[in-house]
């Protein structure tokens, strides 16, 4: 089973939407979101709205999709602390590397927030990637400032020798000024391919998804 880690340029860049689009596109694929904050109680258990969306796609249990759940809608390390818990990055890494799902050929692992979001007082998603070496798919939320955020993310990945499979342009605003020019700029400056583009509220448009 191939595994990919889906991270983004920022919170609310559209990782969940794009991840679900990838699951729709590829047969025999599934998605999980191992860590989520901002969960609410439903039927005596904490539930995350993003995990519920993945469940609708996957028909997997929430326990498989989202084993680490916390209440407050803040950074995972703070939300876990408020719940009297802590996140062990080694356990998260082991879970994502060893999870086996029948008939699933591609597993998309959605992170919480961006690459440098703290999971505890020492570790970030970058440390998770150093442990797992799972290749990254970068979701770029197309908005003002995305070029800077994207190039900074690329630099961190490069310095730490983390493989990036490619990036996806997620068009958040149908009225964004010079949208195509921004995408062209990123294509020229990034060292990995544009895999796909999602137009505002629309389906994913394949550009280079066959490389996954």
From Swiss-Prot:
One of its GO terms (molecular function) is dethiobiotin synthase activity. Its EC number is 6.3.3.3. SUPFAM superfamilies: P-loop containing nucleoside triphosphate hydrolases. It comes from the Bacteria. Mg(2+) binds at residues 16, 50, 110. CDD domains: DTBS. GO terms for cellular component: cytosol. ATP binds at residues 12-17, 50, 110-113, 170-171. It catalyses: (7R,8S)-7,8-diammoniononanoate + CO2 + ATP = (4R,5S)-dethiobiotin + ADP + phosphate + 3 H(+). It comes from Legionella pneumophila (strain Paris). The active site is at residue 33. Homodimer. InterPro entries: DTB_synth_BioD, P-loop_NTPase. It holds the Pfam family AAA_26. This is ATP-dependent dethiobiotin synthetase BioD. It is found in: Cytoplasm. Its cofactor is Mg(2+). Keywords: ATP-binding, Biotin biosynthesis, Cytoplasm, Ligase, Magnesium, Metal-binding, Nucleotide-binding. Catalyzes a mechanistically unusual reaction, the ATP-dependent insertion of CO2 between the N7 and N8 nitrogen atoms of 7,8-diaminopelargonic acid (DAPA, also called 7,8-diammoniononanoate) to form a ureido ring. Transmembrane segments: none annotated. Pathway: Cofactor biosynthesis; biotin biosynthesis; biotin from 7,8-diaminononanoate: step 1/2. The gene is bioD. Belongs to the dethiobiotin synthetase family. GO terms for biological process: biotin biosynthetic process. Substrate binds at residue 37.
């Amino acid at each position: 089973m191939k595994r990919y880690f889906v991270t983004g340029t920022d919170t609310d860049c559209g990782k969940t939407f794009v991840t679900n689009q990838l699951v729709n596109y590829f047969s025999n694929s599934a998605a999980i979101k191992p860590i989520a904050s901002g969960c609410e109680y439903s039927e005596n258990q904490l539930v995350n709205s993003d995990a519920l969306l993945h469940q609708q796609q996957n028909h997997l249990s929430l326990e498989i999709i989202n084993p680490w759940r916390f209440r407050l809608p803040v950074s995972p390390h703070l939300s876990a602390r408020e719940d009297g818990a802590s996140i062990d990055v080694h356990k998260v890494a082991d879970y994502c590397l060893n999870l086996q799902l029948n008939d699933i050929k591609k597993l998309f692992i959605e992170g919480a927030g961006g690459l440098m979001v703290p999971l505890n007082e020492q570790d970030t998603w970058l440390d998770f990637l150093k442990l797992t070496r799972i290749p990254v798919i970068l979701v770029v939320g197309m908005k003002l400032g995305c070029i800077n955020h994207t190039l900074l993310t690329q630099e961190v990945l490069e310095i730490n020798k983390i493989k990036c499979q490619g990036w996806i342009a997620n068009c958040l605003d149908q009225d964004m000024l010079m949208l195509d020019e921004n995408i062209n700029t990123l294509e020229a400056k990034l060292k990995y391919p544009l895999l796909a583009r999602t137009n505002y509220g629309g389906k994913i448009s394949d550009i280079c998804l066959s490389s996954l």
